[in-house]
Amino acid sequence: MRATTIALMMTLTTKVSAGSEDICRANSLAHNVYKEANRLEKVLASQLPLKLEEGLEFTSVSSDKNQLITYMTILYERFVLEDKIRDDGRSMKSLAHTMEIMSADSACSNEASRAFIQLGNVRQFIYIFRDGEQFLDILVERC
């Protein structure tokens, strides 16, 4: 249940496409994705915060039209994470790339989330440090 919830949370973020007059129903099923994003936001919000792994917490979720935005908090300050990454012989750039892949995998591995994206929606993952500094803003627009 928890794994399904996490995967669903990470999958249902969408971005408004420029030029679409009725993005709310601009999909092959004429399904109202605004309402679906809002419904999912409420379901997920009731289960937050949720610690996903050491140093990472799913802290909040919001929806904007056909977009579901997932806010993840890195439970360190930037300098602490940089030191940890450097000690592992990696760079912040390589970490960012890994997180992009993991976000896309998470968004596309859940059937409901993948369907949401395939209807033309976008999942958004915003990663911030515990002091509020933003680290990454990742969009998953296709699976």
Q: Would you name each region that the model predicts?
A:
Residues 1-8:
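Sec-dependent signal peptide recognition
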Residues 18-19, 102-103, 138:
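Disulfide-bonded cysteine motifs in exported proteins
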Residues 72-76, 127-131, 142:
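A mature extracytoplasmic/lumenal domain signature
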Residues 23-25, 107-109, 142:
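Sequence contexts marking disulfide-bonded cysteines in secreted/extracellular proteins
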Residues 114-137:
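Short, exposed beta-strand-loop hairpins at the edges of beta-sheets
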Residues 20-63, 75-77:
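N-proximal, solvent-exposed amphipathic alpha-helical segments enriched in charged/polar residues
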Residues 59-109, 113:
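Mature extracytoplasmic domains of secretory-pathway proteins
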Residues 13-15:
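N-terminal signal peptide c-region/cleavage motif recognized by signal peptidases
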